[in-house]
Amino acid sequence: MLHLTIVAVGRVREKYLVAGIEEYLKRLRPYARVRILEAPEEKVPDKPSPAGVEQILASEGRGIGRLIPPSSFTVALDREGVMLSSEELAGRLADLALAGKNEVALIIGGTLGLATFILQQADLRLSFSRFTFPHQLMRLILLEQLYRAFKIQRGETYHR
């Protein structure tokens, strides 16, 4: 069974997102062990300077780095990453399990994204879209896609 660790910046406060996240965590239980770890979120001023942006990204990146399980296959969610279909994601997860890589960390950045050093350390940079999504919403989208991937792997009804 895969162990999935979602490392995300900040907390989710919106009740509708919390409810959706809890629902997909429950749905994923038969397929994988999933936990969400939260790195501290830095306050972002309205118009941060380039140096301020780098400082915030570095600080959040250090927090993320402390939470990534050692020897895990790391996936950084990045708008500039590779785009996969749901079927391709299902295949990648199956391939990881077959290769004995049972520990997977999926990293969601904060408001400004991810520090360069986190992106460089990732085994895979994955994009869900060229659009920018709120990082809190991305947790729900990621969990739904993981659930869909496991349903596809098993040939169970859900994916259309």
From Swiss-Prot:
Q: Which keywords does the record carry?
A: Cytoplasm, Methyltransferase, rRNA processing, S-adenosyl-L-methionine, Transferase
Annotated S-adenosyl-L-methionine binding sites? 77, 109
- Protein's UniProt keywords contain Plastid: no
Protein's cellular compartments: Cytoplasm
Q: What is an example of a GO molecular function annotated in this UniProt entry?
A: rRNA (pseudouridine-N3-)-methyltransferase activity
Q: Coiled-coil segments, which residues?
A: none
State where it is primarily located: cytoplasm
- Signal peptide range: none
**What GO cellular component term, any one, is given?**
cytoplasm
What assembly does the database describe for this protein?
Homodimer.
Q: Which family does it belong to?
A: Belongs to the RNA methyltransferase RlmH family.
Protein name in the entry: Ribosomal RNA large subunit methyltransferase H
Query: Whose protein is this, by species?
Result: Moorella thermoacetica (strain ATCC 39073 / JCM 9320)
